[in-house]
Design a protein with these regions (language model features):
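Bacterial Sec-exported substrate-binding components of ABC uptake systems
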Residues: 3-5, 13-51
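Short, intrinsically disordered, charge-balanced linker/junction segments flanking boundaries
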Residues: 11-17, 134-137
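Extracytoplasmic/secreted envelope proteins and their assembly/folding machinery
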Residues: 35-38, 50-54, 101, 105, ...
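Conserved acidic residues
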Residues: 39, 92, 110
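Short His-Asn-centered micro-motif
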Residues: 44-45, 114-116
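A short, structured surface patch at a secondary-structure boundary
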Residues: 47-101
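Charged, glycine-enriched surface loops/patches
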Residues: 64, 121-137
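Proline-aspartate-enriched helix->loop->beta-strand connector
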Residues: 101, 105-114, 130
């Protein structure tokens, strides 16, 4: 949660041409340089990252989610806690267990927030956008 709040402090209302960056240490002790005002956040965990971002007024442009038996996608507890889900927002579904790297690239993120249980190597995510890891408590 500390990472999410730290990143939210960096989120601003405007984007400048040459976006300044700020360094912080993520929950795994890595120093990460992130945009001072990220506008296009991708979340790699629905309940631990996406829901808190939505609750704080910073919905991600794309998120990990779950799949129903009928094949439709949803945010775990999303409707219950926030009223937000993939079918009533502009948020893009990027996968469940296996994350769709092409969908992340297509979302054009300026910040990716992941957590240690994701199968996607952080080195691969860092080639797309600055990536911070959040360890859920």
């Amino acid at each position: 949660m500390r990472l999410i709040f730290s990143l939210l402090l960096l989120v601003g209302c405007t984007v400048q041409a040459a976006e300044p960056v700020q360094s912080f240490t993520d929950d795994l002790g890595r120093v990460v340089n992130v945009p001072l005002h990220p506008q296009r956040i991708v979340s790699l965990h629905d309940l631990d990252i996406t829901i808190p971002l939505i609750e704080l007024g910073v919905p991600p442009v794309a998120s990990h989610g779950r799949t129903r038996p009928d094949g439709s996608h949803f945010l775990r507890s999303g409707v219950l806690l926030t009223g937000v889900d993939f079918d009533n927002s502009n948020m893009t579904y990027i996968g469940t267990a296996d994350i769709d790297i092409e969908a992340i690239v297509a979302a054009k993120p300026d910040l990716i927030i992941t957590e240690p249980s994701r199968n996607t190597p952080i080195e691969q995510l860092e080639k797309i956008a600055p990536t911070g890891q959040h360890r859920s408590s």
